[in-house]
Curated annotation (Swiss-Prot):
<comment type="similarity">
    <text>Belongs to the ZNF593/BUD20 C2H2-type zinc-finger protein family.</text>
</comment>
<keyword id="KW-0862">Zinc</keyword>
<keyword id="KW-0539">Nucleus</keyword>
<comment type="function">
    <text>Involved in pre-60S ribosomal particles maturation by promoting the nuclear export of the 60S ribosome.</text>
</comment>
<dbReference type="Pfam" id="PF12171">
    <property type="entry name" value="zf-C2H2_jaz"/>
</dbReference>
<dbReference type="GO" id="GO:0005737">
    <property type="term" value="C:cytoplasm"/>
</dbReference>
<protein>
    <recommendedName>
        <fullName>Zinc finger protein bud20</fullName>
    </recommendedName>
</protein>
<keyword id="KW-0690">Ribosome biogenesis</keyword>
<keyword id="KW-0479">Metal-binding</keyword>
<dbReference type="InterPro" id="IPR013087">
    <property type="entry name" value="Znf_C2H2_type"/>
</dbReference>
<dbReference type="InterPro" id="IPR022755">
    <property type="entry name" value="Znf_C2H2_jaz"/>
</dbReference>
<dbReference type="GO" id="GO:0005730">
    <property type="term" value="C:nucleolus"/>
</dbReference>
<keyword id="KW-0963">Cytoplasm</keyword>
<dbReference type="InterPro" id="IPR051879">
    <property type="entry name" value="C2H2-ZF_Maturation_Protein"/>
</dbReference>
<keyword id="KW-0863">Zinc-finger</keyword>
<dbReference type="InterPro" id="IPR003604">
    <property type="entry name" value="Matrin/U1-like-C_Znf_C2H2"/>
</dbReference>
<dbReference type="GO" id="GO:0008270">
    <property type="term" value="F:zinc ion binding"/>
</dbReference>
Length: 124
């Protein structure tokens, strides 16, 4: 008997994208909005489908935990501290995107304001 022939088809055509988006978390700009509206996370409704009945939630990481002890251990960990570091940066806005392609009105910088106000006449 001869050897088994190799497959001549695409092995996993796009499956990695399906697996990646199936359990996709929240983006940083969504978490920024959650941090500004943190009052709605003070009293969470009881949900039997979530870990810890949905009562122990880390807003910065958008994760539920089984107990308050698990939440405290998480907040001391590297993953949580790395997320806090990423959240210090302001999210990219639509105005910045439009200014990058010269569609919208960019914010006027200090240098351009000074250039507009300086009407200096040079003596000959």
């Amino acid at each position: 008997m001869g050897r088994v022939a190799r497959k001549r088809k695409h092995h996993s055509n796009g499956n990695h994208a399906l697996f990646r988006t199936r359990v996709y978390g929240r983006d940083l700009d969504q978490i920024h909005n959650d941090l500004t509206e943190s009052e709605k996370f003070d009293k969470l409704p009881i949900d039997p489908d979530l870990p810890g009945l949905g009562q122990h939630y880390c807003i910065e990481c958008a994760r539920y935990f089984d107990s308050s002890q698990a939440l405290l251990v998480h907040k001391k960990g590297k993953v949580h501290k790395r997320r806090l570091k990423n959240l210090r940066e302001e999210p990219y806005t639509q105005e910045e995107a439009e200014a990058a392609v010269n569609i919208g009105q960019p914010k006027q910088s200090v240098a351009s304001k000074l250039a507009d106000n300086s009407n200096v006449v040079m003596a000959d």
